[in-house]
Amino acid sequence: MLKGRNLLDPMDFSLEELEEVFKLADEIIEEPEKFLHLCDGKILATLFYEPSTRTRFSFEAAMLRLGGQVIGFSEPNSSSVAKGESVADTIRTVGCYADIAAMRHPKEGAPAIAAMYSDIPVINAGDGSHQHPTQTLTDLLTIRSLKGDLSNLTIGCCGDLKFGRTVHSLVKALSRYKNSKFVFMSPEELKIPDYIRKEILEKNNIEYKEVSKMEDAMAELDILYMTRVQRERFFNEDDYVRLKDSYILDGEKMKYAKKDMMVLHPLPRVNEIAYEIDQDPRGCYFKQAKYGMYVRMALIAKLLGVR
């Protein structure tokens, strides 16, 4: 039973509970008109302390398509946060008006703090460079829908693996499925964090390797998960400029890939995926964005207990 629960980390739900969410998402995709009034009278609060396009719009569209309403802010300067209000006080106040909240915050752990003080379910919509569990649900639903299974996959993660919260959450989630293998491709300065390597991969005897060239790994991958180098995580502009074009996926590199490999990207992209890949049927990142709305519809319905 997911009613009243928070989603702060992809490990918060068991595999069985994740499957519940995915099955409901399948139903919504199949017959969306059946769910147009599921959340009549319910309100979602979107508390976005960091810029967002896809995640915020996806949450808002999800609630509106369920018949609910949305309140919130898209940057903290438009709220009492600008006056120094704490996360704890903000969520207590928002809980007086809304039935569920989605929070994005630049500080790691801020949504978890909010959940401690909240009377309504809190969804982590991304906290610093830590976790992004609803993007992970999006990724898993996309893979499950297009591949048919989440087991026995070799997943390549490429780009900013140090600050890339979507990668951290995805590795944690897929590590629970049978025979997952990982290949990490990144500049030395942006390697996967030690806590992922030691606490998730090595602790659970999950096979992984790190390579410097994309071409060295492409042939074995079932999934290639591309990420951008995030300018907003750098203190030094020179470092960003030096690293931002380290890995670029283009048609030449795709020649090494399996015919059924999937290219995913949490978006936004900068130039790490060439536009020519948009015409390749293996480029699934815009399908992935659409699945994001459906899985958030299912998640909201489950946490509110209306399904």
UniProtKB/Swiss-Prot annotation:
Disulfide bonds: none annotated. Carbamoyl phosphate binds at residues 54-55, 104, 132, 135, 267-268. Pfam families: OTCace (PF00185), OTCace_N (PF02729). InterPro entries: Asp/Orn_carbamoyltranf_P-bd, Asp/Orn_carbamoylTrfase, Asp/Orn_carbamoylTrfase_sf, Asp_carbamoyltransf, Asp_carbamoyltransf_Asp/Orn-bd. GO terms for molecular function: amino acid binding; aspartate carbamoyltransferase activity. Pathway: Pyrimidine metabolism; UMP biosynthesis via de novo pathway; (S)-dihydroorotate from bicarbonate: step 2/3. Its EC number is 2.1.3.2. GO terms for biological process: 'de novo' pyrimidine nucleobase biosynthetic process; 'de novo' UMP biosynthetic process; amino acid metabolic process. L-aspartate binds at residues 83, 165, 228. It catalyses: carbamoyl phosphate + L-aspartate = N-carbamoyl-L-aspartate + phosphate + H(+). Keywords: Pyrimidine biosynthesis, Transferase. Heterododecamer (2C3:3R2) of six catalytic PyrB chains organized as two trimers (C3), and six regulatory PyrI chains organized as three dimers (R2). Catalyzes the condensation of carbamoyl phosphate and aspartate to form carbamoyl aspartate and inorganic phosphate, the committed step in the de novo pyrimidine nucleotide biosynthesis pathway. PANTHER family: ASPARTATE CARBAMOYLTRANSFERASE, ORNITHINE CARBAMOYLTRANSFERASE, MITOCHONDRIAL. Belongs to the aspartate/ornithine carbamoyltransferase superfamily. ATCase family. This is Aspartate carbamoyltransferase catalytic subunit. It comes from Clostridium botulinum (strain 657 / Type Ba4). The lineage of its organism: Bacteria, Bacillati, Bacillota, Clostridia, Eubacteriales. The gene is pyrB.
